[in-house]
């Protein structure tokens, strides 16, 4: 399990050929930015950054005379960031061009000096301590203004939120809200402190925004003064403006003008981001309601029957519920190899149970699985109509589907299909109108396979084609729901379409088996590999080569040499090579149409 600090970082892209668990080897004394100890150190610094962001404006406005406790805490925090500067000189960095970690000390130092080194040093110098060392103006405004450079550390928080927003383990909505709230609180805190600083530095305390409301405000408790400043800041930011606290002099007026101009941009930023988050959350629901309303109006305008309207609304509701799965969009965005692996993992166990594919090769199974698409259907949904043109084959994964046949104007339920059964295959393979209708009984998940895709796969795999056609023939012979005319027509169309027509009928199973065996033997003969053999002799410089011979490839190399000796009886054959003069020692590597060369040495 990864530690909590791991979510703050993005690991480097591994080079091609690297193993998933390959460790990163760096030079001695060089720190990896992805080391767990360094990540813990960075997480600790983030806590100190939050403290610095709050204390810097507060010290500038309210703490004219720093106590030794506050000064000690500030110096300790500065020392931690000074240590981080030293560590950065030994910290490897990720090259944005090669995406490799650079561990060359010279390059690390050069990069740091040319980037954030000067800013990090200026934000780490203990200016208050320097004032105390010089014994003059130790708590002067100049030193306190220089201490505001510590706000440069906020860039670490900005990088943190940028990483958190990309972390899929965290809720993006709440990360964005946290960021917006943090920006708002920091702006309110800084503006309140700055406005109090202006009033505190004004010569006439009575003519200040806080002095007009609270006479002798400097004698008040620190908490009262801070809350009053924050109250003014938040009412101005939200444009509430009760009027009880307002600018009394030109300095405060100028600051109020600048603050309100800043508020215009900040408010636009906050409202724009929040609106975007809210719209993203409600847009899907609004589109669903609009679709339901449009479908209802369509049904009412065209006076559709109630059951058709219910089917429309059920389909829309199911699509809305399953939209979050986004199966097709997710799979389409992946490479073909990953899609094939996912499809095999999800659908291959289901395909193996289908009677139509019993006995087919694993290669054919893979081809079928990768072309299937998963779909959801609501209850009482019509999947296939009777006598419609065959378009798709469906396999039931979950749910229930009933098979209906209309006889003499009356629709009857013939069978209820369960998980792992296929339907629509008779019309598709036999190229006839669908003999039955299929309706879902409850919410069902189906695998859909296009007609053209299925036929192409069957045609490309001759051995599997015979197995599939044989399985379908046996299924139809065992099924007594179809008439003899329908069965004979289906079998005839099936074999005519795939070029394997036989005269079997559903009424004579013995003749069908004998005919199928004869056809299988004939097909095997047609599928023998044909090769062209040549004679190549090295005994003479310019031999008269005999004509090449086209033969059927036998089952072994010994038989092949025997045939070649008969064809080239005047030569002594010693070796068999391919056109690239690579020796062949296995009959299985020879393909249909290859040119083989027998050598005489």
From Swiss-Prot:
Keyword Calcium among UniProt keywords: no
Residues annotated to bind a nucleoside 3',5'-cyclic phosphate: 356-475
Domain named KHA: residues: 530-601
Extracellular face residues: 64-71, 134-144, 201-227, 248-251
Main location, first listed in the record: membrane
GO cellular component, one term: monoatomic ion channel complex
Topological type in the membrane: Multi-pass membrane protein
Intramembrane sequence windows: 228-247
Stretches in topological domain Cytoplasmic: 1-42, 93-112, 166-179, 273-601
Subcellular location as annotated: Membrane
SUPFAM superfamilies: cAMP-binding domain-like (SSF51206), Voltage-gated potassium channels (SSF81324)
Record-linked PROSITE patterns: CNMP_BINDING_3, KHA
Family annotation (InterPro entries): cNMP-bd_dom (IPR000595), cNMP-bd_dom_sf (IPR018490), Ion_trans_dom (IPR005821), K_chnl_volt-dep_EAG/ELK/ERG (IPR003938), KAT/AKT (IPR045319), KHA_dom (IPR021789), RmlC-like_jellyroll (IPR014710)
Functional summary from the UniProt entry: Probable inward-rectifying potassium channel. Assuming opened or closed conformations in response to the voltage difference across the membrane, the channel is activated by hyperpolarization.
Keywords: Ion channel, Ion transport, Membrane, Potassium, Potassium channel, Potassium transport, Transmembrane, Transmembrane helix, Transport, Voltage-gated channel
Pfam families assigned: cNMP_binding, Ion_trans, KHA
Family the UniProt entry places it in: Belongs to the potassium channel family. Plant (TC 1.A.1.4) subfamily.
Segments forming a coiled coil: none
Secretion signal, residue range per the UniProt entry: none
Domain remark from Swiss-Prot or TrEMBL: The segment S4 is probably the voltage-sensor and is characterized by a series of positively charged amino acids. The pore-forming region H5 is enclosed by the transmembrane segments S5 and S6 in the Shaker-type (1P/6TM) and contains the GYGD signature motif which seems to be involved in potassium selectivity.
GO MF annotation terms: voltage-gated potassium channel activity
Keyword Ion transport: yes
Residue intervals passing through the bilayer: 43-63, 72-92, 113-133, 145-165, 180-200, 252-272
Name assigned to this protein: Potassium channel KAT2
């Amino acid at each position: 399990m990864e530690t909590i600090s791991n979510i703050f970082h993005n690991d480097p892209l591994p080079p091609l050929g690297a193993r998933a668990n390959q460790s990163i080897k760096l030079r001695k004394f060089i720190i990896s930015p992805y080391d767990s100890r360094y990540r813990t150190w960075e997480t600790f610094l983030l806590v100190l950054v939050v403290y610095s962001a709050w204390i810097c404006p507060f010290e500038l406005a309210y703490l004219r005379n720093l106590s030794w406790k506050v000064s000690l805490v500030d110096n300790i925090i500065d020392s931690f960031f000074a240590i981080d500067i030293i560590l950065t000189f030994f910290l490897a960095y990720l090259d944005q061009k090669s995406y490799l970690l650079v561990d060359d000390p010279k390059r690390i130092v050069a990069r740091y000096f040319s980037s954030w080194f000067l800013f990090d040093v200026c934000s780490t110098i203990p200016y208050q301590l320097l004032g105390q060392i010089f014994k003059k103006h130790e708590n002067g405004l100049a030193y306190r203004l220089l201490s505001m450079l510590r706000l440069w550390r906020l860039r670490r928080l900005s990088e943190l939120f940028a990483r958190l927003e990309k972390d899929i383990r965290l809720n993006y909505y709440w990360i964005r809200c946290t960021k917006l709230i943090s920006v708002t609180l920091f702006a309110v805190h800084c503006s309140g402190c700055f406005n109090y600083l202006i009033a505190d530095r004004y010569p006439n305390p009575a003519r200040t925004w806080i002095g007009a409301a609270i006479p002798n405000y400097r004698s008040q408790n620190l908490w009262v003064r801070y809350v009053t400043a924050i109250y003014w800041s938040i009412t101005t930011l939200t444009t509430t403006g009760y009027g009880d606290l307002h600018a009394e002099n030109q300095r405060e007026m100028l600051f109020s003008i600048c603050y309100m101009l800043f508020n215009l941009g900040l408010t636009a930023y906050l409202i724009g981001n929040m609106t975007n988050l809210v719209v993203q959350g409600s847009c899907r629901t609004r589109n669903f309601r609009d679709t339901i309303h449009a479908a209802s109006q369509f049904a009412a305008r065209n006076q559709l029957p109630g059951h058709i309207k219910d089917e429309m609304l059920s389909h829309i509701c199911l699509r809305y519920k399953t939209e979050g799965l986004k199966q097709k969009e997710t799979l389409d965005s992946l490479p073909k190899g990953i899609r094939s692996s996912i499809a095999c993992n999800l659908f291959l166990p289901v395909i193996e149970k289908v009677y139509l594919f019993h006995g087919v090769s694993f290669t054919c199974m893979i081809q079928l699985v990768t072309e299937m698409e998963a779909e959801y259907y609501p209850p009482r949904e019509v999947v296939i109509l009777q006598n419609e043109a065959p378009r798709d084959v469906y396999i039931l994964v979950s749910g229930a589907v009933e098979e209906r046949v209309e006889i003499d104007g009356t629709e009857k339920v013939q069978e209820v299909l369960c998980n792992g059964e296929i339907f629509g295959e008779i019309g598709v393979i036999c190229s006839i109108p669908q003999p039955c209708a299929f309706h879902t009984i409850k919410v069902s998940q189906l695998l859909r396979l296009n007609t053209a895709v299925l036929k192409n796969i069957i045609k490309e795999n001759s051995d599997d084609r015979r197995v599939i056609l044989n399985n379908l023939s046996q299924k139809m012979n065992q099924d007594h729901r179809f008439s003899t005319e329908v069965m004979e027509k289906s079998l005839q169309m099936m074999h005519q379409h795939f070029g394997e027509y036989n005269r079997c009928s559903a009424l004579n199973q013995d003749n069908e088996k004998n005919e199928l065996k004869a056809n299988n033997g004939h097909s095997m003969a047609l599928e023998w590999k044909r090769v062209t053999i040549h004679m190549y002799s090295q005994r003479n410089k310019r031999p008269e080569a005999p004509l090449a011979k086209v033969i059927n490839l036998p089952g072994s190399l010994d038989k092949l040499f025997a045939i070649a000796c008969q064809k080239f009886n005047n030569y002594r054959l010693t070796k068999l090579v391919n056109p690239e003069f690579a020796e062949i020692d296995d009959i299985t590597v020879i393909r249909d149409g290859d040119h083989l060369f027998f050598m005489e040495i």
